[in-house]
């Protein structure tokens, strides 16, 4: 059987809908041989019970994390691979980032309440890593918010629409979250023994209007080892954009390693599933071997 890999998957430890164990089960079902759980600012998924479960299922699991950073008002995500998930300094640094998210939650909740929305701060604050997605989901699933949502949107919005209209920069409930720069995140990852990869560069072209040259400057500043070139981006019109060929060539030109990731959060009819099984991205066995060799060296 040809190997299949997916190096960017989220779980309920951050903003995914499946537990780490359920992610493993889904990977088995889809015949994906090697995965990396890369939750936001946490490595909580990597507990001994999961490692044992992965061993029983015969899947390769590469320890990973996705750190949220900011530079020049652009939100940049940095992936770390083959990190020491028990490194005490690294765990303390991640804890600091998560604590900043709790401060962010309270500030956003205050603005949302002024706008007429009820937010369950007590429930959300119990999450390991609270994100915009968690807050938006809490808002739009509350019956108490139905009238306000219909007043503001003319209909019941989905999670993404609520975030883009109410919570993003320039919107009424926007709050700037205290975080680290890409360079600082890269240093955290290296100090934990990991490889540094810029997540989904395609997204920064569409969300932040960054040119490839500007993206390259960020890559150079953080001294990234590679980029997540094989990736399906979903734009604001819910259209799939595949620039994998462009970013693979970009990586080759600038002597960067490449990775592949679904950025899986949940099962729906739009976003790629684990392993990008239904997408037109096909890696050769040699390409997969080279990726794994790079990450594990």
Predicted features, each with a name:
Residues 55-214, 285-291:
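Extended substrate/RNA-proximal surfaces in nucleic-acid metabolism proteins
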Residues 1-74, 176-268, 278, 285-295:
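An N-terminally biased module of ancient metal coordination in phosphate/nucleic-acid-related enzymes
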Residues 271-272:
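Cys-dependent protein tyrosine phosphatase-like superfamily
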């Amino acid at each position: 059987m040809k190997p299949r890999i997916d190096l960017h998957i989220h779980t309920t430890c951050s903003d995914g809908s499946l537990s780490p164990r359920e992610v493993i089960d889904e990977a088995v079902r889809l015949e994906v041989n090697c995965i990396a759980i890369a939750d936001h600012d946490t490595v909580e998924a990597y507990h001994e019970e999961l490692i044992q479960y992965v061993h029983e299922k015969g899947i390769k699991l590469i320890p990973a994390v996705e750190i949220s950073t900011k530079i020049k008002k652009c939100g940049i995500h940095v992936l770390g691979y083959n990190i020491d998930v028990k490194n005490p300094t690294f765990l303390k640094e991640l804890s600091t980032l998560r604590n900043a998210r709790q401060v962010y939650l309270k500030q956003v909740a205050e603005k949302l309440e002024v706008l007429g929305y009820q937010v369950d701060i007590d429930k959300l604050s119990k999450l390991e890593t609270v994100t915009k997605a968690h807050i938006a989901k809490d808002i739009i699933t509350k019956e108490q918010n139905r009238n306000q949502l219909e007043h503001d949107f003319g209909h019941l919005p989905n999670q993404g629409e609520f975030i883009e209209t109410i919570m993003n920069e320039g919107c009424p409930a926007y709050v700037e979250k205290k975080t680290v720069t890409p360079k600082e995140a890269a240093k955290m990852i290296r100090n934990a023994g990991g490889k540094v990869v810029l997540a989904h560069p395609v997204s920064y072209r569409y969300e932040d209007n960054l040119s490839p040259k500007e993206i390259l400057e960020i890559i150079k500043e953080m001294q990234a080892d590679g980029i997540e070139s094989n990736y399906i981006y979903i734009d604001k019109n819910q259209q799939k954009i595949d620039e994998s060929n462009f970013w693979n060539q970009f990586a080759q030109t600038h002597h960067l390693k490449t990775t592949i990731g679904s950025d899986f959060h949940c099962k729906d009819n739009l976003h790629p599933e684990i392993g990008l099984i239904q997408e037109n991205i096909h890696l050769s066995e040699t390409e997969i071997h080279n990726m794994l060799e790079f990450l594990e060296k």
